[in-house]
Amino acid sequence: MTSVQLETPHSGKYEQPTGLFINNEFVKGQEGKTFDVINPSDESVITQVHEATEKDVDIAVAAARKAFEGSWRQETPENRGKLLNNLANLFEKNIDLLAAVESLDNGKAISMAKGDISMCVGCLRYYGGWADKITGKVIDTTPDTFNYVKKEPIGVCGQIIPWNFPLLMWAWKIGPAIACGNTVVLKTAEQTPLGGLVAASLVKEAGFPPGVINVISGFGKVAGAALSSHMDVDKVAFTGSTVVGRTILKAAASSNLKKVTLELGGKSPNIVFEDADIDNAISWVNFGIFFNHGQCCCAGSRVYVQESIYDKFVQKFKERAQKNVVGDPFAADTFQGPQVSKVQFDRIMEYIQAGKDAGATVETGGKRKGDKGYFIEPTIFSNVTEDMKIVKEEIFGPVCSIAKFKTKEDAIKLGNASTYGLAAAVHTKNLNTAIEVSNALKAGTVWVNTYNTLHHQMPFGGYKESGIGRELGEDALANYTQTKTVSIRLGDALFG
């Protein structure tokens, strides 16, 4: 069986694929293995899905290779764009279902999940528009040569996506890869496979030929490792932790030196100057850390506030965080649902305990909410020092630290005091301060008087240990193309 009927409070009953999507069909795994998908809201088993093993990865890669070397390689850019737009239209048509499935196995609030799907639609349409605009150039060197440079697809792309934004990452990865003419084998996160499989069911309906987009469910140490080290995969793209990113980079290097892009962890500073609109800043700082349950690689988990407004800010921020509704992801007023899994829940609670043990002050939160499901109260630590684990390490949950700074130079130094460099934010009414601090911060994205406002037209990625390459925007096309130089001799003689 490769599908099962499920039901959500938002979408009603629907058919949930559970197989591996290879060659436009849902199939069972070669070894017949399945694994449980857990509902993080109540800790129950939602269903089982088929687990991809190394044998299944081989089959999926072979399907992608056959498609790439066959008719897909000759497909016109215009038609690739049409197919991506068809897929975007189907996402839009099925927005309620896709959002509900996200909330079911990820636990995110349904209002946030709908926002994710809208962003998927925008992303797929954006890259659909790019498909026929990827151009080369002619370079003049000497009168007797004609030289041109063209962009070609890389080939078979392995893509490994995380559990925090399952469908959004699905679109971020597939959009540019397909626009550039590649084929794809995408592995969903084992915690959240359901949305990616429902999305895969739309691929055939959109008109894609068999083998162009393949979606498999499985574990990182098995299917992810097989993709990363596969000798017939030309490119691997990964979003997730820095620890796993290093493993993937090593696997790529020790196999066929496949190209790699990595979007990894973060410990992003959110800096509030004394001249900022304090109420506006508090709203964005709250959103910056507690959005998506704090499960964002770019979460603003290190808050730095200028000392003259520090006490006032802490009090107001605490009051704002306490208003965040934590609970059933399908309730209309819920802002924060459960953490994605017991493993993640336990990890976050360990960090909270470490903060307490180190002497930090819990301004609010610091506890589990309820006794069922992986819910954690929004947590703010004050009286922190830069050497504390909760300040240095990525927690990936609804936990932030808040500290004082005196001068602009102090803020910059504190902001850059991390091995990560994914994102940062500056809150100020002074344009000179905004520009100077933004330029000085070692981060791939800096927001000013806002936070988490990503857009598919804007490149996103990190400095330092936060990754290699950029997602989104025109920059992402470079992840999925290679450059070919052609030089044609026009004269007859070898020299002269």
UniProtKB/Swiss-Prot annotation:
It catalyses: an aldehyde + NAD(+) + H2O = a carboxylate + NADH + 2 H(+). GO terms for cellular component: cytoplasm. InterPro entries: Ald_DH/histidinol_DH, Ald_DH_C, Ald_DH_CS_CYS, Ald_DH_CS_GLU, Ald_DH_N, Aldehyde_DH_dom. Pfam families: Aldedh. This is Aldehyde dehydrogenase. CDD domains: ALDH_F1-2_Ald2-like. The lineage of its organism: Eukaryota, Fungi, Dikarya, Ascomycota, Pezizomycotina. Belongs to the aldehyde dehydrogenase family. Its EC number is 1.2.1.3. PANTHER family: ALDEHYDE DEHYDROGENASE-RELATED. It comes from the Eukaryota. Keywords: Allergen, Cytoplasm, NAD, Oxidoreductase. One of its GO terms (molecular function) is aldehyde dehydrogenase (NAD+) activity.
